[in-house]
A protein has these predicted regions:
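NAD(P)+-binding Rossmann beta1-loop-alpha1 motif at the extreme N-terminus of oxidoreductases
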Residues: 23-66
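Short, Lys/Arg-enriched N-terminal segments with co-localized hydrophobic residues
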Residues: 1-22
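Rossmann-like NAD(P)(H) cofactor-binding subdomain of soluble oxidoreductases
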Residues: 110-173
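A generic structural signal for alpha->beta connector loops
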Residues: 46, 84-86, 136, 161
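Conserved N-terminal Rossmann-fold NAD(P) cofactor-binding segment
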Residues: 48, 54-102, 108-116
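Short, intrinsically disordered, charge-balanced linker/junction segments flanking boundaries
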Residues: 19, 174-175
Length: 175
């Protein structure tokens, strides 16, 4: 199943409506296609968004306005929300999550040779943010994962008082 950009944007707007009336502090973990577009859209709605990645070169490129992939209008949107100081980029998930109320996990889950999902990137992100989550934080998993993964995340993060929401992305890039 693929979701077009309009549906992705509407999905982000719906999340934004949940946050409407607030100036939420949001951490987006993962600066790939899903993470960067999610972060830029949420920042355009007025939220304070920090996008984190463990690739220091990617973070440095984003800080100077270099977008690592093509998506119509994204470069301009990122520039606008960075200039308005609503979007910033950091190295390391914990650095983004320290002050955040909402944490969007947008990490790759590539397929293993046997067809199962490699959850190592997701697990690494969860481990990084677990020590800095504020009580009652909302963790939104946008990574595409097998059934039962949300429960595992809740078991890992629930001891911190975090609540887990599953909102996976199925999309087609750059058309």
């Amino acid at each position: 199943i693929f979701v077009d950009r309009l549906t992705f944007y509407i999905d982000t707007i719906l999340i934004g409506e949940v946050l409407e009336g607030t100036m939420a502090k949001i951490a987006v973990i993962g600066a790939g296609y899903v993470g960067l577009t999610t972060g830029a859209c949420l920042a355009s709605l007025g939220h304070d968004v920090v996008v984190a990645d463990n690739d220091n070169d990617r973070v440095n490129s984003l800080k100077i306005g270099e977008i690592p992939f093509f998506e119509p209008g994204l470069k301009e949107l990122v520039g606008k929300v960075v200039d308005s100081q609503r979007l910033s980029f950091v190295f390391g998930a914990a650095n983004a999550s320290k002050e955040a109320e909402f944490h969007f996990l947008c990490l790759p889950t590539p397929s293993n040779k046997d067809g199962s999902s490699d959850l190592s990137f997701l697990e690494e992100g969860i481990n990084e943010i677990s020590s800095v989550l504020n009580p009652n934080s909302i963790v939104v998993n946008k990574s595409t994962v097998p059934l039962g993964t949300a429960k595992k995340i809740q078991n890992s993060l629930g001891r911190n008082g975090a609540h887990v929401v599953s909102n996976p992305e199925f999309l087609r890039e750059g058309e």
